Structure formats: C-alpha cells, structure tokens
C-alpha cells in the first residue's frame, strides 16, 4: 500500500485539491513521535476561509481513518500515524515479490532523455575530476531508466579543435613510438606540454599548428590518419577505466561529429537577425538577460564550444525528440549553458527549457599520498587501482581466509570511490581521504556493503524456511522503522529525478543500512524466541538486502555477497 497516496486520497475526499498537488505538499514530521505523514493546511485557508489550525481540526473529524492508527492535529498540520502491522506486511510483500524491480515504475514510459556525461578530452589525462561527471551521469542514466525513461547516454568526447594541430606538430617532432604504445596518454601529454614550451621560443610553431588543423578540417588524409590514431589510442586507455566502472555509452558522438553541422547553425542565427559583429567576432547579445554575449565565431572565423553545443542540442532534438537533455558538466560552466540555452530560445526553440545543466564541485586531496604520473595530474585509473590495493590490505587484516578476495576487493574498492563521489550534494567539493573512504564505519560505501553482506550471511545460515510469515510478530520500534524506510525507496528515487541529484539515493541507502544495523543489534534473528518471529525477521532481512542491492545498482555499484 502506498501510504502517501492513501493520505492524499483521504484528504482529496474532503477538499477540492488534486491528489498530485496533495502528494507534493505532504511532509515527513521532524520527530517520529509526531506521526508518519503530515499535511499542512495553509493551502486550504483561502478556500475554507478559516485559519489553517481550524481547518486541520475539521478535517481530523471528517477524514476516513481506515488504515491508520490515528490522525491528530499539530497546529495547522494534520498528522497521520500509519497502522504499523499493515505497513510492514504491505512493504515486505511488495519488496519480496518485485525483487530487483522494487522501486521502479513506468512514470517515464514513452519519454526519451539524453544524458551527456564523462566527455574526456582526447589525448589528455582521464583524471580524478572526470569521475564526478562520469559517476553522476551514469547514476542518473540508471535511475531514469529504472523509472521507465528511455535514456540515451552520450560521451561527448573532446576530439576537435586547434589543440590537435599542435599535437600533430608535436608528434612529428618529438614522439617516442615505444613510449606511445606503452603509455599513450602519458606520451601524448608529454609532447603536448613540450610543444607549448617550444612555441614560446618559436612563434612559427603556432602558425604551423593552425595550418595542421586547417588541413584536418579540410579532410587531409595524413592529418586525419594521425587524428584517428590519437583518438583510438585515447579511447583504448579510457575504456580501461570504463570497464573498471562497468560503464557503457549509447553514443560517442563528440565535438568532431558536429563540425559539419555548425555552418547551418550560424546561418540560422544570422537569419533570425541575432548575429552581431563585435570586434570582428560574431556574437549573440544577451544584455537583457544580464549575461555577457554568447560568442558564435571568433575573429579568425573559428567556431567555439557554444557553436558546437548549439549544433549538438539541435541535432539531438531532431534525432531523439528528447523529453529532457541533461548536461553533466562542472559548475564553472553554468554561465556557458545559460548562454547556450537562452540563445536556443531566441532562435525560436522553445524546447530549450527542457535542456538542463547538472553542475558539480571539485575534487581535492586530503594529503599527497596519492602518486601522480607527472607530478600534478592524478589519473583516474591509478586512483581506482590504488583503492583496490588498499581494500585488499584491509581484507587481509580482517578476513584473510575470505574466498575470491581479489574480486571482493575490486568491487569494494571501486564502489567505495564511486560512493564517495555520490554521497553528498553534487555541487559540494570532495576532499579525498583514504582513511574515511575505505572505513567500514560511518557513512561510507564499505559500511553499506558490509550491512548487505551481514544480511546475506544471515540468510545463508537461515537456509530455506517454510510457511507463511506472520508480520504482526514484527512489533518493535526498530522493525517498524526499518520496514517504513524500505517502503520509501521509490520516494527517494523520485526525489533524485526531481532534483537531478543521485545523492538522494545514496543518502537513502545509508539510512537503510543504519536502520538495519540498529535492528540487528537490538534483536536476535536466527535465535529468536519462536519460529514465527524468526521467519518474520528473516523476511525483513531478505527485503533489506534486496533494497540495498537495488539502490547500489542504481548508483553503479556492485554488491559483495560475503566479506
């Protein structure tokens, strides 16, 4: 039974409000002793022409209380106490029957959502900052798909621009082929940095680089061949990380894909009378929106990121007819996306309102213990490998006889890192501290994983239990609070979708793990006082494990069955 919906239906019977609006207004009381759901009566003051606290009293008398232990007023609020036995039975039966589908819905059926995320630059390091966009984007993709949306995951690769002209010049002069095959990104970065150092002494190098890129734009065979090689070598390195994270994309259409689509966009902007000359550059003026101009073409005629993003948005709308187009890109790019979306609106594309920028913070290191390949960039692959190594050390200390230690360490280590990136509001910076990230205590990935493994251990020891569970035996505060939390899984998911914030699911699963451990510490399960209590508690454990697994899967994290 969906109690939130039941509350809404009961209120609707006595007011003119619609169920959808009532559900949005319903709150969870700040203290458990105040009830399970609260409805603020302020919204009804105009209709009833009475003070909200008087309206609450009237509704309390009229409302159908079936399914609730009691309904009380707290000032202007109407507070509902659910029937604990009915709730526990409804929630556990629903979880155990729906299993891996529990928490899902068809709310997004028939709606396409484009999610652009990860998007590293070709020939540049895939560093720890990239995991923010990669983890958030992957989680949003999974969460939206779980609720019925048809998602299109796009890795908008940074594979175009004048930097490739520079890289071609650097390659021809200084490349070490052996080093390139051994560590492609490291070698490409080395020669790119060398190019900039040499160009300060010899300005002719910059001219040569521009000429290289011009030839690439014109489709020159030699330059195109080198560009493809840089791209292939980079993707080979990137895919190592994506494989570790278990991430796949539906499209790798990067900046180069839109290179032949930009002239049409520039022409469309010009045809709408929006293109203005500014010191030789072409811009769209956005003064009335309190924004600087959106540059469309530089003074040398070259297009820039905004032009490519405009072309990409128009192409995606034509190709996918999206319900939403989500850009998971760092918060510093917020102004850029406001300019792009506003320009789209000025061009007459009202669907620009369906384009959403999902920003995120920075990653900082708590100490310098994480080694770097070139002194300043921390490669993501190295970070993940180090996390696996550190986790294996912990396993060897705590449970040296554990089977499949390597596999467990991989899942736990990588999962711990991803969990850290998704734990708090995405716009908050992350301070990376191994001691905290890999701790089995506190609000960490390993703590949640350990809670799941603890539950699975109980289920293995319990074996096959026969008979129908009598959920009225689950009468304690800890049992009710855990079951009630399990019933709120879909609410957490819908909040994550509403706010485009995976942390809503992460915070939720932390609370489930905490509630489970409170229950575990307060009550005997396998040594319960009688078989009916034992069976009911085992079912509660089984449902908890299912919800934790479903939640972690939505975050892109694998569970471990034993640790």
UniProtKB/Swiss-Prot annotation:
One of its GO terms (cellular component) is cytoplasm. Keywords: Aminoacyl-tRNA synthetase, ATP-binding, Cytoplasm, Ligase, Nucleotide-binding, Protein biosynthesis. The keyword Nucleotide-binding applies. PROSITE patterns: AA_TRNA_LIGASE_I. GO terms for molecular function: arginine-tRNA ligase activity; ATP binding. InterPro entries: aa-tRNA-synth_I_CS, Arg-tRNA-ligase, Arg-tRNA-synth_N, Arg-tRNA-synth_N_sf, ArgRS_core, DALR_anticod-bd, Rossmann-like_a/b/a_fold, tRNAsynth_Ia_anticodon-bd. It holds the Pfam family Arg_tRNA_synt_N. It is found in: Cytoplasm. GO terms for biological process: arginyl-tRNA aminoacylation. The keyword Protein transport does not apply. It catalyses: tRNA(Arg) + L-arginine + ATP = L-arginyl-tRNA(Arg) + AMP + diphosphate. Coiled coil: none annotated. Its EC number is 6.1.1.19. A motif ('HIGH' region) lies at residues 120-130. It comes from the Bacteria. Its main location: cytoplasm. Monomer. HAMAP family: Arg_tRNA_synth. Belongs to the class-I aminoacyl-tRNA synthetase family. This is Arginine--tRNA ligase. It comes from Clostridium botulinum (strain Hall / ATCC 3502 / NCTC 13319 / Type A).
């Amino acid at each position: 039974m969906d109690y939130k919906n039941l509350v809404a239906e009961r209120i609707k019977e006595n007011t003119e409000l619609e169920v959808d609006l009532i559900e949005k207004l319903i709150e969870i009381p700040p203290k458990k002793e105040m009830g399970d759901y609260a409805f603020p009566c302020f919204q009804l003051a105009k209709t009833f022409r009475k003070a909200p606290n008087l309206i609450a009293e009237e509704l309390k008398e009229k409302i159908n209380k079936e399914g609730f232990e009691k309904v009380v007023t707290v000032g202007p609020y109407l507070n509902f106490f659910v029937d604990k036995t009915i709730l526990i039975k409804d929630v556990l039966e629903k979880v155990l029957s729906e299993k891996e589908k529990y928490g899902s819905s068809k709310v997004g059926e028939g709606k396409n959502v484009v999610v652009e995320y990860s998007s590293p630059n070709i020939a540049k390091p895939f560093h720890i900052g990239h995991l923010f966009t990669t983890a958030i984007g992957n989680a949003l993709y999974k969460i939206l798909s779980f609720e019925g949306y048809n998602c299109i995951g796009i890795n908008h690769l940074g594979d175009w621009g004048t930097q490739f002209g520079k890289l071609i010049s650097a390659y021809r002069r200084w490349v070490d082929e052996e080093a390139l095959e051994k560590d492609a990104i490291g070698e490409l970065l080395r020669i790119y940095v060398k190019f900039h150092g040499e160009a300060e002494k010899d300005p002719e190098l910059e001219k040569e680089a521009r000429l290289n890129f011009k030839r690439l734009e014109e489709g020159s065979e030699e330059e195109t061949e080198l560009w493809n090689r840089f791209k292939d070598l980079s993707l080979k390195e990137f895919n190592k990380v994506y494989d570790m994270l278990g991430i796949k994309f539906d499209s790798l259409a990067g900046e180069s894909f839109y290179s032949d689509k930009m002239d049409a966009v520039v022409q469309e902007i010009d045809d709408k009378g929006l293109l203005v000359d500014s010191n030789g550059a072409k811009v769209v003026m956005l003064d009335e929106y309190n924004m600087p101009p959106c540059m469309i073409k530089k003074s040398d005629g070259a297009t820039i990121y905004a032009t490519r993003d405009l072309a990409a948005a128009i192409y995606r709308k034509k190709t996918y007819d999206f319900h939403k187009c989500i850009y998971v890109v760092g918060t510093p790019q917020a102004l850029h996306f406001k300019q792009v979306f506003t320009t789209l609106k000025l061009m007459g594309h009202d669907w620009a309102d369906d384009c959403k920028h999902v920003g995120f913070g920075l990653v900082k290191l708590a100490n310098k213990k994480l080694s770097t390949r070139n002194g300043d960039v921390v490669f993501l692959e190295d970070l993940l490998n180090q996390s696996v190594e550190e986790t294996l050390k912990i396993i060897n200390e705590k449970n040296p006889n554990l089977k499949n230690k390597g596999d467990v360490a991989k899942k736990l280590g990588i999962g711990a890192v991803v969990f850290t990136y998704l734990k708090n509001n995405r716009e908050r910076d992350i301070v990376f501290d191994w001691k905290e990230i890999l701790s089995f205590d506190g609000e960490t990935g390993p703590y949640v994983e350990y809670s799941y493994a603890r539950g699975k251990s109980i289920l293995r020891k319990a074996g096959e239990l026969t008979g129908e569970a009598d959920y009225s035996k689950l009468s304690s505060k800890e049992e009710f609070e855990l079951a009630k939390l399990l019933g709120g899984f879909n609410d957490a998911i819908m909040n994550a979708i509403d706010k485009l914030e995976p942390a809503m699911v992460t915070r939720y699963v932390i609370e489930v793990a905490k509630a489970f451990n409170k229950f575990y510490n307060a009550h005997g399960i396998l040594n319960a006082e009688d078989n009916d209590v034992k069976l009911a508690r085992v079912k509660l454990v089984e449902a908890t494990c299912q919800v934790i697994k479903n939640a972690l899967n939505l975050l892109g994290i694998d569970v471990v069955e034993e640790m």
